[in-house]
Amino acid sequence: MIKLERVYFNYKTMPMNFNIHIKPQERVAIIGASGAGKSTLLNLIAGFERADDGEIWLNGVNHTYTEPYERPVSMLFQENNLFTHLTVEQNIALGLKPDLKLSAAEQSLVRQTASAVGLSRFLDRKPTALSGGQKQRVALARCLLRDKPILLLDEPFSALDPALRAEMLDLLSQLCNEKKLTLLIVTHQPSELQGRIDRILTVENGHFAKNNDLK
């Protein structure tokens, strides 16, 4: 569950105001022109930006002033932020232990998560040996390994070709079902999400301008 109550953020020359309630396990797309406030909205929810006023509730808890690591949120960007000197398995494991000192049970969990996104055969490879789609699978697996109930995606697949985007969106839908995730995804291709999301929110000039319920 995501609830923003009169959240105000004084962003440079465009003050932002957000009010929204997203139900548990709901899947919502965020659209709008560049600079409208879409990424800032996700950063406020994740805690990378601090609201100047209002409240941010996540899964029934007030997280307005908590640190990003304390919030029940994982976030995936267009830039997958993989470390080229680490293997696929190690890059995924960072989501669990930044020092990579894993127990046998944790190592097993990393491999299970890699398998869930179709990476079992690539665990020993470095990111430089992967395709764009495979790199995003690694980043997605790292997010999932954190086992947070809310997943925020900021145009994560926009650099991929249409066929790969469709493949990743199908995988995302499957994982949301299996893990009962609440999803918020920023996109410039909302038509590709038809049948995969519950509603579309349009952001204009730092506020929600339209709420299109698809179900």
From Swiss-Prot:
Pfam families given in the database record: ABC_tran
Q: Which InterPro entries match?
A: AAA+_ATPase, ABC_SmlMolc_Importer, ABC_transporter-like_ATP-bd, ABC_transporter-like_CS, P-loop_NTPase, Thiamine_ABC_ThiQ
Which residues does the record give as ATP binding sites? G32, A33, S34, G35, A36, G37, K38, S39
Q: What class of enzyme is it?
A: translocase
Q: What GO cellular component term, any one, is given?
A: plasma membrane
Question: Where does it localize?
Answer: Cell inner membrane
Q: What topology does it adopt in the membrane?
A: Peripheral membrane protein
Entry annotated with the keyword Cell division:
no
The protein's Enzyme Commission number = 7.6.2.15
Disulphide bridges: none
Query: What's this chain's function?
Result: Part of the ABC transporter complex ThiBPQ involved in thiamine import. Responsible for energy coupling to the transport system.
Annotated protein name in UniProt: Thiamine import ATP-binding protein ThiQ
Which gene does this sequence derive from?
A: thiQ
